[in-house]
């Protein structure tokens, strides 16, 4: 499948996505160790990405709640796996992973986060997909993105690249970026072939990402 030409969703799929995120959306807990994880009793998806990639803004756009996920005033300060309960009747956990790649974070902190994230990715049976957020303004994957992909390939955890802030880049350039990244994903065993394009500020790509996540929530 050509990732530059992502398949269209049916009206039913888009409506399922709308309904899921129109329901309950609550912060549940921040987890600092595997012993603190909630029961794996529903599907989980998680958002990963470099610090300041726009994870909090995207979560808020998906849920339609401006302050559900709060970005830290200082990049790299989020040290927890933040769990959000999405949808009525406990349908889905959305997990916001700590941002990576921020230079001012100490090596000790980085090592601790990395260990926690590795353990989570390898040992969470209810994890359906990791959405790896990439700032479109970067123009390509960063080395740290590729390192996280290596980790997920090794753990056999399916992941999908989501471009953020595409409204900040000319349309023609965004399409070139998608093609470039999609070509790299073809060489990776655990990568989903479709690169999603989003803008939390403009709402672009939000209905489609909701539909994508809703389909995963139905896996139970």
From Swiss-Prot:
List keywords of the entry alphabetically. Cell cycle, Cell division, GTP-binding, Magnesium, Metal-binding, Nucleotide-binding, Septation
* Source organism, top-level taxon: Bacteria
| Record-linked InterPro entries | G_ENGB_dom, GTP-bd, GTP-bd_ribosome_bio_YsxC, P-loop_NTPase
GTP-binding is among the record's keywords: yes
Q: Which Gene Ontology molecular function entries are recorded, alphabetically?
A: GTP binding; metal ion binding
Q: Which cofactor does it need?
A: Mg(2+)
Protein's job: Necessary for normal cell division and for the maintenance of normal septation.
- Gene designation: engB
Query: Which Gene3D superfamilies has this protein been placed in?
Result: P-loop containing nucleotide triphosphate hydrolases (3.40.50.300)
Entry keyword Transcription: no
- Tell me the protein family, please: Belongs to the TRAFAC class TrmE-Era-EngA-EngB-Septin-like GTPase superfamily. EngB GTPase family.
* Annotated source species: Hyphomonas neptunium (strain ATCC 15444)
Every copy of the EngB-type G domain together lies at: 41-219
Q: What is this protein called?
A: Probable GTP-binding protein EngB
Q: Which PROSITE patterns match?
A: G_ENGB (PS51706)
The residues that the entry says bind Mg(2+) are 56, 78
Q: According to its UniProt record, what is one Pfam family this protein matches?
A: MMR_HSR1
